[in-house]
Amino acid sequence: MNNIRKTHPLMKIVNSSFIDLPAPSNISSWWNFGSLLGICLIAQILTGLFLAMHYTSDTMTAFSSVTHICRDVNYGWLIRYLHANGASMFFICLFLHVGRGLYYGSYMYLETWNIGVLLLFAVMATAFMGYVLPWGQMSFWGATVITNLLSAIPYIGTNLVEWIWGGFSVDKATLTRFFAFHFILPFIVAALAGVHLLFLHETGSNNPSGLNSDTDKIPFHPYYTIKDILGALIMITALSSLVLFSPDLLGDPDNYIPANPLNTPPHIKPEWYFLFAYAILRSIPNKLGGVLALVLSIAILAIIPLLHTAKQRSMMFRPLSQCLFWILVADLFTLTWIGGQPVEHPFVVIGQLASVIYFMLILLIMPTTSMIENRLLKW
């Protein structure tokens, strides 16, 4: 068995990635989220596959097919809620994974980081299109509002929106193509995740200290396999509790009303994991400006390595940067809260302030603070 593990062409890849992989001896539980994201992706693909067996992507029957899944299909309710809440777990793990990368300077692995940013965009696109499929009120109006943002692009905007819609409004053609894209994108995400791992294993994992760990490596199995299993059990427990006790906690009640193009809901808002970006979009009165801010709120991650002015990689020994990092986290929570509130005083002003603070922290305050820390350490 020992020989086949190291000689068989396929087993050799698995062995060098998950068994004999040299890993730093001091990586904490913050390094668990990569494997949790892999588990989430597999769970989403499997539950999605079973949902697709019963779902119909037609405006007349989409809503009732989801009802049929919940009422008539064996454990259909469980599959549907695992899929919906699995997306929430996916984004919780994603945000924590990105946060870990920012805190410990993992973004210095440029290829791994940039593919991670691409993955984030791909997962967000997948989740957005998936939210449209049940064809409830929030599905329809969310799709209308978000796709309409593309009309802000000069010259080609209107044509682009009508091309995406497949007509002059969100209708049957839109739903069908969104279903097709929602089905294919997770497999593209899986392929990108493979490339993400490939580049990670070229350099090896970072660690909390941010120092080179070549002198102190341990095999991935059994040390980190058992650690990942513990993380997976905790996540599965959390997801099961959510699905079995309050499956609609994170959803919008409006999505239990079939889509009606003649009746606009009082508050159109996306799922909770997009609210921070939605708040940034709404905080700018100009349409094109808002769209640019929305894209930049995520795309800004790609230039984080260029903004790294510190002489140390990790924030572990940089207390000022740590304070700013947690202010950034608090700011993102504030934006998430504002994104779910109506557009009225004082929420508008709070959203604008939080948006300015978000970009100021990343582009100006954190790099400047890192330089101050360098001076304090006489580096």
Curated annotation (Swiss-Prot):
Localization in the cell: Mitochondrion inner membrane
Q: What is its main location?
A: mitochondrion
Q: What is the effect of changing H345Y?
A: In strain: Isolate HS1296, Isolate HS1297 and Isolate HSO960926-1
Q: How is the cofactor bound?
A: Binds 2 heme b groups non-covalently.
Q: Name one GO molecular function term.
A: metal ion binding
Q: Keywords of this protein's UniProt record, alphabetized?
A: Electron transport, Heme, Iron, Membrane, Metal-binding, Mitochondrion, Mitochondrion inner membrane, Respiratory chain, Transmembrane, Transmembrane helix, Transport, Ubiquinone
Gene3D superfamilies on file? Cytochrome Bc1 Complex, Chain C
The residues the record assigns to binding heme b b566 are H97, H196
Q: Where does a ubiquinone bind?
A: H201
The entry marks the following residues as binding heme b b562, namely H83, H182
Required co-factor(s) are: heme b
Q: Name one GO cellular component term.
A: mitochondrial inner membrane
Any one of the GO BP annotations: mitochondrial electron transport, ubiquinol to cytochrome c
Its quaternary organisation is:
The cytochrome bc1 complex contains 11 subunits: 3 respiratory subunits (MT-CYB, CYC1 and UQCRFS1), 2 core proteins (UQCRC1 and UQCRC2) and 6 low-molecular weight proteins (UQCRH/QCR6, UQCRB/QCR7, UQCRQ/QCR8, UQCR10/QCR9, UQCR11/QCR10 and a cleavage product of UQCRFS1). This cytochrome bc1 complex then forms a dimer.
Q: Tell me the protein family, please.
A: Belongs to the cytochrome b family.
Q: What else is known?
A: Heme 1 (or BL or b562) is low-potential and absorbs at about 562 nm, and heme 2 (or BH or b566) is high-potential and absorbs at about 566 nm.
| Name the UniProt record assigns to this protein | Cytochrome b
User: Organism, per UniProt?
Assistant: Crocidura dsinezumi (Dsinezumi shrew)
Q: Give the source lineage, highest ranks first.
A: Eukaryota, Metazoa, Chordata, Craniata, Vertebrata
